[in-house]
Curated annotation (Swiss-Prot):
Organism: Amia calva (Bowfin)
Keyword set includes Electron transport: yes
SUPFAM superfamilies documented for this protein: a domain/subunit of cytochrome bc1 complex (Ubiquinol-cytochrome c reductase) (SSF81648), Transmembrane di-heme cytochromes (SSF81342)
Keyword annotations of the record: Electron transport, Heme, Iron, Membrane, Metal-binding, Mitochondrion, Mitochondrion inner membrane, Respiratory chain, Transmembrane, Transmembrane helix, Transport, Ubiquinone
Lineage: Eukaryota, Metazoa, Chordata, Craniata, Vertebrata
Entry function: Component of the ubiquinol-cytochrome c reductase complex (complex III or cytochrome b-c1 complex) that is part of the mitochondrial respiratory chain. The b-c1 complex mediates electron transfer from ubiquinol to cytochrome c. Contributes to the generation of a proton gradient across the mitochondrial membrane that is then used for ATP synthesis.
Protein name, UniProt field: Cytochrome b
Amino acid sequence: MATIRKTHPLISIINGAFIDLPAPVNISVWWNFGSLLGLCLITQIVTGLFLAMHFTSDISLAFSSVAHICRDVNYGWFLRNIHANGASLFFICLYLHIARGLYYGSYLYKETWNVGVVLFLLVMMTAFVGYVLPWGQMSFWGATVITNLLSAFPYIGDTLVQWIWGGFSVDNATLTRFFTFHFLFPFVIAGASMIHLLFLHETGSNNPLGLNSNVDKITFHPYFSYKDLLGFIILLAGLMFLTLFSPNLLGDPENFTPANPLVTPPHIKPEWYFLFAYAILRSIPNKLGGVLALLFSILILMIVPITHTSKQRSSTFRPLTQILFWTLVADMFILTWIGGQPVEHPFIIIGQIASIIYFALFLVFAPLAGWVENKMLSW
């Protein structure tokens, strides 16, 4: 007789996704990051829910309410620091997850990949509106600068900006709607993650060799459930270490000052996880050009499956592509560094060169390397 986990309408779905799911035997630790992202999302939703109970989305009270959470609410300081640093770990896992997909050719599962890119954009939007909520100096000026970029759109730009602001400047209406969006988006992300998983389970997981593994699969539980558990322990230990020993390491000191529309901070910059995109934005002197470059720096991921020219899926046996991949990683680090620097020589030219290399790697060098490797195979 079949067990309840296989016959029950609801439990059978969970069984198919997390228990009896056939998984390739040889998937490495790089395949842990999907579940780690799920853990990050749950952590952020739970801590965010408790923070929202004590937060006040009003410009005269927002900063004070965050201070009140940290001082007066039981374990409020802990919740706030877990939530703030959890965002950083979320993005670390996200970038590693995307890097894994690029290296091993997982992007050839087009539906899964494109839903993943949409998820990436949603997470970025959520993090942006969330950063505005404490209403510190960098919150206010970050919101002003980034929302102002929409004015670069021809004809509708200015109207669009005022529509998003809910007035003629970043004000109370802006804070209220950003709080609404920040509360809503994580649940949208959770829903989109389900679609991401649905598409993934249509094809099954890729593996480090990039070969068909249907002949050699094992059940997800107990093998990979325990492997994921190890990842959970390491991630949570890292989060606790960061939160309890150095909670403000990744934050901007400017955000400890309440928002003041009359005083502009000397260097306006986003959180570290947006610096690479910010560097690409700043590398183009034209406003509209910069905004488009910013947009395409993320959307370019969607064309990766189209520009894949190699006969092999994974980069495991493709030395040229491996060199390009690690060049991209180095380039991302350079862009992240440049994004945090002032706009002056030599940082301007370094940022421009790094931005050109970033796009060239995706559009020119990767397809070219695949083609050359195909030729090398035929020799």
